[in-house]
Amino acid sequence: MKQQKDASKPAHFFHQVIVIALVLFVSKIIESFMPIPMPASVIGLVLLFVLLCTGAVKLGEVEKVGTTLTNNIGLLFVPAGISVVNSLGVISQAPFLIIGLIIVSTILLLICTGYVTQIIMKVTSRSKGDKVTKKVKIEEAQAHD
């Protein structure tokens, strides 16, 4: 007897590469229509996240390739490092300005991350608090009966 193909079974490596390549291809198309400049890789990450959350793409369809890419992420930064070395002339013209921009942007990023985390924690605690309050009220009502 032939075994039926299980939906939870991880897809073959080549199939996973095709899924990720298609997401990147679609994100490149979206990038060309965007009114503001945004990297296709960022659009692709958001698109893949939405596809995974909606169930249009199963985790098994991209997990193996995603893990492989994450494990070898250092290799993906080599071109960026080379372009920084090639731009040393530009960097040497205004080093203090660049260092200042890096410091200010890092501080702004930390502040924004902190505020977003606080908002998420408040929303999460309220929703959990409502569930606990409802459960206690139900238990009290059952105890009085």
Curated annotation (Swiss-Prot):
Any matching Pfam family: LrgA
TM segment ranges: 10-30, 33-53, 72-92, 96-116
GO CC entries: plasma membrane
Leader sequence segment: none
Subcellular location: Cell membrane
Entry annotated with the keyword NAD: no
Chief localization: membrane
Membrane topology value: Multi-pass membrane protein
Biological process per Gene Ontology, one example term: killing of cells of another organism
Keyword Transmembrane listed: yes
Function (record text): Inhibits the expression or activity of extracellular murein hydrolases by interacting, possibly with LrgB, with the holin-like proteins CidA and/or CidB. The LrgAB and CidAB proteins may affect the proton motive force of the membrane. May be involved in programmed cell death (PCD), possibly triggering PCD in response to antibiotics and environmental stresses.
UniProt record similarity statement: Belongs to the CidA/LrgA family. LrgA subfamily.
Name of the protein this chain belongs to: Antiholin-like protein LrgA
Organism phylogeny: Bacteria, Bacillati, Bacillota, Bacilli, Bacillales
